Design a protein with these regions (language model features):
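Divalent cation-coordinating acidic motifs and surrounding scaffolds
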Residues: 1-130, 135-210
């Protein structure tokens, strides 16, 4: 999909090992949007702030949906993700930073709910599925997660107790179960004001139960 950020999600593969087809799912929404997992390059409607008014949600980098076939004939679906960053870029002052951080987390969670709707559709059809990419989020990554109950990663993995409805990522599981704060990381950032590095688990490969 074209992206206003000029950053489009790509898939590198060996054509001798995989046959790959771009396979967008969901119906394109109208300009007003849809509540029912529309195509990722259109508009999703979701009530971000519990005021009974749904807002328009869009991806600046729409997820890439592919149908893959191995040489042995195994078929699977892949969704490549680059979710919204929660960083309060451009906000000046502590209050503005907090306000923008919360607003960005709401939007990021809505994007993850949109992806989760798509995941549930694939699982209901019995598809083998991989969801992978940069979620710009992870279990326990910041204090604002407590306001919403779950991280975006947990939403995409699935919160229902039935294992048939859940995706699995062993690194995410380690982060969720860790009691001592020792978790895998996939990204490292330098915080200039504090003169230190910050490490986080932001990138995931989630697979269906099969």
């Amino acid at each position: 999909y074209p992206s206003e950020t000029e950053q489009e999600i790509a898939f590198l593969y060996d054509p001798d090992r995989l046959t790959v087809r771009h396979a967008p799912q969901g119906a394109p929404s109208t300009s007003h949007g849809s509540h029912d997992a529309p195509r990722f390059d259109t508009t999703f409607r979701y009530d971000l702030d519990a005021d009974n008014i749904s807002e328009s949600i869009r991806f600046s980098k729409p997820p890439l949906e592919l149908a893959l076939t191995t040489p042995g004939g195994t078929k699977l679906r892949l969704i490549g993700v680059h979710a919204k960053s929660k960083n309060p870029y451009g906000a000046i002052g502590r209050e503005a930073q907090i306000r923008l951080s919360i607003e960005n987390r709401r939007k990021q969670l809505a994007q993850c709910l949109w992806i989760r709707q798509r995941v549930e559709g694939h699982l209901a059809h019995g598809d083998s599925l991989i969801v992978m990419g940069d979620f710009n989020d992870g279990p326990g990554i910041d204090e604002f997660e407590k306001l919403f109950g779950h991280s975006g990663v947990e939403i995409v993995l699935g919160t229902h107790p039935d294992p048939a409805t859940r995706l699995t990522d062993p690194h995410a599981s380690m982060a969720l179960q860790s009691k001592v704060g020792i978790t895998p990381t996939s990204a490292r950032f330098y915080i200039a004001q504090q003169k230190r590095f910050f490490e986080a688990l932001l990138d995931f490969v989630m697979v269906s139960p099969d």
